Amino acid sequence: MELKKTAESLYSAKTDNHTVYQNSPEPRDSRDVKVFSLEGKQTRQEKTTSSKGNTRTESRKFADEEKRVDDEIAEVGSKEEEQESQEFCLAENAFAGMSLIDIAAAGSAEAVVEVAPIAVSSIDTQWIENIILSTVESMVISEINGEQLVELVLDASSSVPEAFVGANLTLVQSGQDLSVKFSSFVDATQMAEAADLVTNNPSQLSSLVSALKGHQLTLKEFSVGNLLVQLPKIEEVQTPLHMIASTIRHREEKDQRDQNQKQKQDDKEQDSYKIEEARL
């Protein structure tokens, strides 16, 4: 009897418990579930790698741009330095030989006046003799009004000083007399410098006179612009041969003059005869 009750009690208890479980709401899991996808992770990694690659590329481009700008700045700076160096060298050449000592105005003028003759006389004018002799020997001389004439324009060269560049050299020969003239200077300053070069080299003038004597020519006149240069006097030693040659030349010149005079007289008589004939 008690066993039956116990069995019924257990049955009823099971039934009750089962009923309770059925009537009660189902249990729910309130935990948040996160789904991890390997594909999403890989995509994020690729995006991160791509962004890092882009960042590196942009950084590299920026670095290259900065380097290019720096190179251009350095190149411009080097060109400016080179130009300044050239200008400085030109300035140094322009003032080569000049003293940078500060001198008062009056003292400076006196120093220039005192030093000028020394600087001028140091320039060699041997080229004048050379060009005159070569012209007399080799060039064809035109004849104008009974005088033989040569005119040269002096170009810039290593032998011609700057004071004579662009000037005209005129040689006029009349018989055995030769006249030398430098003209057509750029300005009065150039003419004055050229005149100083000639007058401060008397020994070379003497050499020119002697050289022309060897060509049976006498330097009669030497002028630079409107300045007439005083010629050195050279004593001529007369030898029997010189005297004979001088006598022969004198006779030839006299015969030539007589012949020209006779020709003029004959022409005059012939003209008067023709006029008389025409009148008749």
Swiss-Prot record:
- InterPro entries given in the database record: DUF5421 (IPR035359)
* Composition-biased stretches (Polar residues): 12-25
Q: Which domain of life is it from?
A: Bacteria
State the residue spans of region: Disordered.
Answer: 1-83, 248-280
Record's compositionally biased regions (Basic and acidic residues): 41-71, 249-280
Q: Write out the similarity annotation.
A: Belongs to the chlamydial CPn_0705/CT_671/TC_0042 family.
Please identify the protein, giving its name as recorded. Answer: Uncharacterized protein CPn_0705/CP_0041/CPj0705/CpB0732
